[in-house]
């Protein structure tokens, strides 16, 4: 169990939830007060869901209180297909929006955390995606300090973010999750970070599989723990038991991480008697409630940026009697949700929205025009709902490797 939950723009992979615009859209609002409110709503739903899961005896992945959001990497490289998860290319805007998001997630109780927020991915993790497991980032000292680190520093020193996720890539030859320069000298010693560090999934494996900086899981794990990576998403830390027996690391070294992890659980109120946790009173009825939907709609409206309005086409004239909607995105509900998303109780496509908005005497015609991905068929399935430990059958998949010839 690696404490994995997601809420990049709404509680994700845990059933019905209020879905906000993707992070890049939230940044386009330039409204950190509104984002603080949105994050507070998200954390309300996360708390309500967690306590309902506990009542049902469920404590699996995506059912906890430690959330791997926000993503405060800098969207500098357009080849990074996951740039929409970030707040864009500007370090200052990213700092402001990330700070608001963390404050909304973690709450304002002086003694307890509403959720654990996680600032990720530390550091210089900005695509391309395909080589992230072996890439060596070599920014100048100025670029590192001026571009890639400010948002993390803000979230640590002003937001008291409870967790940081270390990145897959290397920085100046050292895997980030084993970097003394990043995690000890900068994060803990210089900035005063008191929380815990969690690895990205499989990042410790990368030390010896792809970076080739360490020989095996044991040596990689020892290095990661000593550099302050307290929790691993993956399996390499299983080797730490053998490392202790071999004298490569001590139990007290492990206890340093253990204490940080238990402190996070205590701050979440997980050891309090029933009724004493200030956040257990949040009712499940808040999940995807009407007020939350209205707030998400308002954020979506604020996120829209008009780049061009040729011949003052917008707003549309009420004299129009026929509107043509062209393109596959008009009816694609999946693309509306982004990634790391929840499942809304109600979803309206662009075409449906236009047809509902116009008067009955306006004809709306639709033409798909082209496919989004050539002629591939894509059938969306919420697979995360099938990956729960409920004793039921899982997913059956057949894999085909065929050479297709166009005739």
Question: Which residues fall in each region the model found?
Answer:
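Glycoside hydrolase catalytic-domain context in secreted enzymes
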Residues: 1-403
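Conserved small/polar residues in nucleotide/adenosyl-binding loops
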Residues: 405-407
């Amino acid at each position: 169990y690696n404490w994995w939950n997601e809420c990049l723009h709404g509680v994700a992979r845990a059933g019905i939830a209020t879905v906000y615009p993707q992070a890049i859209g939230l940044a386009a609002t330039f409204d950190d007060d509104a984002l603080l409110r949105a994050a507070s709503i998200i954390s309300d739903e996360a708390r309500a869901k967690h306590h309902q899961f506990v009542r049902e005896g469920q404590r699996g992945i995506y059912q906890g209180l430690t959330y791997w959001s926000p993503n405060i990497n800098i969207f500098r490289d357009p080849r990074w297909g996951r740039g929409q998860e970030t707040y864009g290319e500007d370090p200052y805007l990213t700092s402001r929006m990330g700070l608001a998001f963390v404050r909304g997630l973690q709450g304002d109780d002086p003694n307890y955390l509403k959720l654990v927020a996680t600032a990720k991915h530390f550091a210089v993790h900005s695509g391309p995606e395909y080589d992230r497991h072996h890439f060596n980032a070599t920014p100048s000292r100025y670029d590192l300090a001026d571009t890639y680190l400010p948002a993390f520093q803000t979230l640590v020193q002003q937001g008291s973010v409870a967790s940081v996720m270390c990145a897959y890539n290397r920085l100046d030859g050292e895997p980030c999750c084993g970097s003394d320069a990043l995690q000890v000298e900068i994060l803990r010693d210089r900035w005063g970070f008191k929380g815990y560090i969690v690895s990205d999934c499989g990042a410790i494996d990368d030390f010896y599989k792809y970076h080739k900086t360490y020989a095996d899981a044991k040596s990689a794990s020892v290095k990661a723990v000593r550099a302050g990576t307290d929790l691993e998403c993956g399996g390499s830390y299983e080797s730490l038991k053998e490392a202790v027996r071999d004298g490569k690391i001590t139990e007290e070294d492990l206890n340093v991480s253990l204490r940080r992890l238990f402190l996070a659980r205590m701050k979440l109120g997980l050891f309090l008697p029933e009724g004493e946790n200030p956040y257990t009173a949040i009712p499940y009825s808040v999940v995807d409630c009407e007020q939350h939907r209205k707030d998400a709609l308002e954020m979506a409206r604020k996120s829209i940026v008009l780049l061009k309005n040729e011949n003052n086409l917008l707003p549309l004239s009420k004299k129009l009697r026929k509107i043509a909607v062209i393109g596959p995105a008009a009816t694609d509900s999946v693309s509306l949700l982004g990634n790391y998303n929840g499942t809304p109780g109600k979803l309206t496509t662009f075409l449906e929205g236009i047809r509902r908005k116009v008067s009955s005497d306006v004809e709306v015609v639709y033409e798909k025009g082209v496919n989004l991905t050539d002629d591939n068929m894509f059938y969306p399935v919420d697979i995360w709902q099938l990956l729960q430990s409920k004793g039921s059958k899982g997913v059956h998949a057949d894999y085909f490797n065929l050479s297709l010839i166009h005739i």
